[in-house]
């Protein structure tokens, strides 16, 4: 599917999600689900990547996300990571990587999804993470899972793992530094969803 069609599909899904939440859900249920839509930004720079986007759905049981991005190297491996700042009020000057050192923030990075970029340089990710689920937690990436979905600041980070290496592909698709070395892993894009 080409980039223009994916962008249109993402826009339609966004509108349908909003319509379902606004029209088809009784008021009691509407308060128990919250949806936010954010563009992706260049990691470390902050510039918006037009035509990209992420949808985050919060419930008391956990969070779900879909993400569409482009400008990737065709055939390279990418992962999407959940970054939960469970107590964003304890962050210093906005939540970010430095806040992992502050135990009051209760920050954690957890794997979300992995993809190989298409021939057109696009990738679509989707994932769900339940409250308290620490599946795939790696050393140094935090100690707690998602605690309170409606109060956490949630970032979704797209990470590059370089060209696909057949013998390491499983790790490249699911580990923070999978395939690195010999490749170089780096965070490329991020979407920030405020509580």
Residue ranges, per PLM feature:
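N-terminal leader/targeting pre-sequences
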Residues: 28-195
């Amino acid at each position: 599917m080409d980039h223009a069609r994916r962008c249109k599909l993402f826009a339609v899904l966004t509108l349908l999600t909003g319509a379902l939440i606004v029209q088809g859900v009784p008021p009691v249920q509407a308060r128990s689900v919250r949806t936010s839509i954010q563009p992706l930004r260049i990691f470390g720079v902050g510039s918006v990547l037009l035509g990209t986007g992420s949808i985050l759905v919060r419930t008391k049981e956990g969070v779900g996300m879909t993400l569409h991005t482009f400008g990737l190297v065709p055939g390279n491996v990418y992962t999407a990571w959940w970054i939960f700042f469970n107590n964003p009020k304890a962050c210093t000057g906005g939540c970010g990587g430095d806040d992992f050192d502050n135990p009051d923030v209760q920050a954690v990075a957890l794997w979300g999804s992995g993809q190989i970029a298409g021939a057109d340089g696009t990738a679509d990710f989707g994932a769900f993470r339940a409250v308290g689920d620490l599946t795939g937690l790696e050393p140094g990436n935090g100690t707690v899972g998602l605690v309170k979905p409606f109060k956490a600041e949630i970032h979704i980070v797209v990470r590059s793992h370089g060209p696909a290496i057949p013998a390491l592909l499983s790790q490249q698709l699911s580990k923070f530094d999978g395939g690195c070395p010999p490749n170089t892993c780096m965070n490329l894009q991020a979407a920030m969803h405020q509580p």
